[in-house]
């Protein structure tokens, strides 16, 4: 998959338990963002969108437009991030050892071949990562570490070195 950017066999995430993780097909979502209700933020009324989840393998990223292209079991989806959010997940985390050598602790989550579970909503032909503080989904982006035979995912929600209480995303 890494060099060809497509699966010549069945997608790795094809047998994920979609009901357990509330994963939807991007094509089944309404192209208009579905507004559930409204809330007030800093004196302005804002729409609260219905959140969906998609999973897929990263095949490309565009640092200028802050987009990531995911290959899902159902097709290709463009995920549009906000600038700060994109930079947070795109950076490589490393530390300098006592002997002066740099050790990579964690690579970018947007490297080709990385599997992600993303929570958000559909806006036209793009998927926008989003979470609400009182939502059942506590993270907008999660790294899929492993998938077992029964479709159960092993997920990583925090970047290495990130505080659990930080609440950035």
Locations of the language-model features?
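Noncatalytic, beta-rich nucleic-acid-contacting surfaces in large DNA/RNA-processing enzymes
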Residues: 1-169
